Structure formats: C-alpha cells, structure tokens
C-alpha cells in the first residue's frame, strides 16, 4: 500500500477561505517587521493583524509600515489581547503567533 502525504494547504486549495494572521504584541519593535514580512510572503492572501498591548516602543508604527492592520488593546495582558482578537476578527482560518519571532 502506497502512502500519500497530504499537507493542510492542499486541503484548502481553491476554497477561497479567508485567513487572518493574529499577532499579539508588547514591545516587539525589534522583530515585528520581520514577522509581518514573513507571514506576508508565506500567506500572501491572508490579512495580518497586530494587536498592540500598550507597547512603549514603535511596535505599532513598524507593523503598520509593513502592511499589517494594527489594533490597540488597552487592557493589559495576553489573555485580554487574545479574547479581543477572536471577538473582533471574523475569518475562516486563524493563524496566531507571537510577534517576537520565536518558534517552539
């Protein structure tokens, strides 16, 4: 029996699904530009949202300059940011990652 490898992207091909990339951020000016650029390159049809959680640096400015939609969440804490993202954004597929470019 021959095995067939199916990638998730193959399952969604030609389905015109809306994809939202959600990036909760706090003081990520050093990395957020690269993170947004990398997601734009990998998922060119996705909408990229950066949720800034009271950053004191240029996180929001840099993310916006790279083409992300920036929203502010004034209630401090990642849990508040995540709840706000899923309340605000309507999409068929959600991709959430941190804005600090870490991969686990």
Residue ranges of each PLM-predicted region?
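Structured catalytic core of nucleotide-sugar glycosyltransferases
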Residues: 2-104
């Amino acid at each position: 029996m021959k095995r067939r490898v199916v990638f998730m992207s193959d399952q969604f091909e030609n389905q015109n699904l809306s994809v939202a990339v959600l990036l909760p951020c706090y003081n990520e000016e050093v990395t957020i530009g690269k993170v947004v650029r990398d997601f734009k390159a990998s998922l060119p049809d996705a909408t990229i949202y950066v949720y800034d959680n009271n950053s004191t640096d240029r996180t929001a400015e840099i993310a916006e300059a790279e083409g992300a939609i920036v929203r502010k969440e004034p209630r401090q804490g990642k849990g508040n940011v995540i709840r706000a993202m899923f309340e605000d954004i309507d999409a068929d597929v959600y991709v959430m990652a941190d804005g600090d470019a870490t991969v686990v």
